[in-house]
């Protein structure tokens, strides 16, 4: 839930107007809107490059995933991995745009560990995959943008660990 929504709901629950501190928080959130949009655009515009770099890094760490019997051995499995990369990158952009990790959790993390275990996908490998995705994504951002984006990737890896 965004800062604005949180403030409004909290104030309404307490039957009051937002405090000056809460309004200051909203002001700070709105002031970062342009950079959050810039980050989301950069990640979306560079999705193919980011996914390609991340998968190369992951499969150099875990070459066994691409060998016979590995989780990305077949073309279908490999393409599913790439699809998941794009999906997680998109989740990160949702969180960045909202300025909150809640969309990431609500849309993509509830039950994710159980799902990967049920599918026989090694969860530690998924954690490595998200770390590779983070490295590749932060590489297309400037230092301020990377500082803002990094915690959203970390949130996903922590949830999977």
UniProtKB/Swiss-Prot annotation:
SUPFAM superfamilies: Globin-like. One of its GO terms (biological process) is photosynthesis. The modification N4-methylasparagine is found at residue 71. Its main location: membrane. (2R,3E)-phycocyanobilin binds at residue 81. Disulfide bonds: none annotated. Contains one covalently linked bilin chromophore. The chromophore is added by phycocyanobilin lyase CpcUS. It is a peripheral membrane protein. One of its GO terms (cellular component) is phycobilisome. CDD domains: APC_alpha. Belongs to the phycobiliprotein family. Heterodimer of an alpha-B and a beta chain forming AP-B. This is Allophycocyanin subunit alpha-B. It comes from Picosynechococcus sp. (strain ATCC 27264 / PCC 7002 / PR-6) (Agmenellum quadruplicatum). The lineage of its organism: Bacteria, Bacillati, Cyanobacteriota, Cyanophyceae, Oscillatoriophycideae. The gene is apcD.
């Amino acid at each position: 839930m965004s800062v604005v929504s949180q403030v409004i709901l909290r104030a309404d629950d307490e039957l009051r107007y937002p405090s000056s501190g809460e309004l200051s928080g909203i002001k700070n959130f709105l002031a970062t809107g342009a950079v959050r949009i810039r980050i989301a655009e950069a990640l979306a515009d560079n999705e193919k490059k980011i996914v390609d770099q991340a998968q190369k890094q992951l499969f150099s760490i875990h070459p066994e995933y691409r060998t016979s019997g590995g989780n990305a051995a077949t073309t279908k499995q490999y393409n599913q991995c790439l699809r998941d990369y794009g999906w997680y990158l998109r989740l990160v952009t949702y969180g960045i745009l909202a300025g909150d990790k809640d969309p990431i959790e609500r849309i993509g993390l509830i039950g994710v560990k159980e799902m990967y275990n049920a599918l026989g996908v090694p969860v530690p490998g998924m954690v490595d995959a998200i770390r590779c995705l983070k490295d590749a994504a932060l590489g297309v951002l400037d230092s301020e943008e990377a500082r803002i984006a990094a915690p959203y990737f970390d949130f996903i890896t922590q949830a999977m660990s």
